[in-house]
């Protein structure tokens, strides 16, 4: 695990401990059960691909630790509507506050503004957060293989399955990919960014996809900014993509998303 990822996860564990002290698990579970039914995150991606398009997970992201503020005029409901109008299959909403200036409310607001399934994009280090995500209305959660051991991953995935949610399992290399395949989820995100030096390398994704068993839905992440990038990935069997910063920096979010998906 990189030093930054270790720092973020340690901070997150402290945050979760405080949240647990504030809200009982029984109360949180009741809220999760009362939430709208999950919208089917992976199913929405697969449906777009089956229709001959690309399954885009369009990200709502205000800032990042490395880039600072990305979107000054930040408006999660408006961004969600723009993404939906332009043909995105799903949303990804950053909820981490200390490092990404996210907030739980952004997820609630974005999902309420559209009909798209939404991923809670956060650093999940405890199954408690999965129940919290469902209580917020999330349809999917992120499992970062680099941040967890096999037992932790299995517990978090089991919580997601219990709540009817999908788990996007993010990997960066072959070892993490092998560990991801021990889980039940076959929604695999391959991050093109090297955590050691933050360079982008599409070749790693091509190689991992080529060694995958049948039945996986692959999502390419990081460094994607044009339809040519998406087409290159598609030539290697990847039809789904998570794109955030390159879209969030555009003035006209809907037009930029359409251009990414269609080239026009």
Curated annotation (Swiss-Prot):
Organism: Rhizorhabdus wittichii (strain DSM 6014 / CCUG 31198 / JCM 15750 / NBRC 105917 / EY 4224 / RW1) (Sphingomonas wittichii)
The protein's name: Indole-3-glycerol phosphate synthase
InterPro entries: Aldolase_TIM (IPR013785), Indole-3-glycerol_P_synth (IPR045186), Indole-3-glycerol_P_synth_dom (IPR013798), Indole-3-GlycerolPSynthase_CS (IPR001468), RibuloseP-bd_barrel (IPR011060)
GO MF annotations in UniProt: indole-3-glycerol-phosphate synthase activity; phosphoribosylanthranilate isomerase activity
Family in the record: Belongs to the TrpC family.
Catalysed reaction, written as an equation: 1-(2-carboxyphenylamino)-1-deoxy-D-ribulose 5-phosphate + H(+) = (1S,2R)-1-C-(indol-3-yl)glycerol 3-phosphate + CO2 + H2O
UniProt GO BP: L-tryptophan biosynthetic process
Pfam families, per the entry: IGPS
Keywords carried by this UniProt record: Amino-acid biosynthesis, Aromatic amino acid biosynthesis, Decarboxylase, Lyase, Tryptophan biosynthesis
EC number(s) from the headed UniProt entry: 4.1.1.48
Taxonomic superkingdom: Bacteria
Top EC class of this enzyme: lyase
Pathway participation: Amino-acid biosynthesis; L-tryptophan biosynthesis; L-tryptophan from chorismate: step 4/5
